[in-house]
A protein has these predicted regions:
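Iron-associated oxidoreductase/ferritin-like identity signal
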Residues: 1-76
Length: 76
């Protein structure tokens, strides 16, 4: 079983990764609107990568008997 302190640290990082994912996605929307499709595509990929990080940590936490939780994500 994973300790409560470590579980909290993992969950805080999961939330941070998802916040970053949302930030990159918002940047992609803005770039695409301005006609910067190449940069927008790159930001979309960055968003996906951050989400993958969050999922990997959540899967690790659950596999070790912890609970993965996402805290409130502030508006980007």
């Amino acid at each position: 079983m994973i300790s409560e302190n470590l579980q909290k640290a993992f969950n805080d990082q999961i939330t941070a990764e998802l916040w970053s994912s949302n930030l990159y996605l918002q940047m992609a929307f803005t770039l695409r609107k301005e006609g910067w499709d190449g940069f927008a595509h790159w930001m979309e990929k960055q968003s996906e990568e951050e989400k993958e990080h969050a999922l990997a940590m959540a899967h690790y936490l659950i596999k070790r008997g912890g609970s993965a939780k996402v805290s409130t994500i502030d508006v980007v």
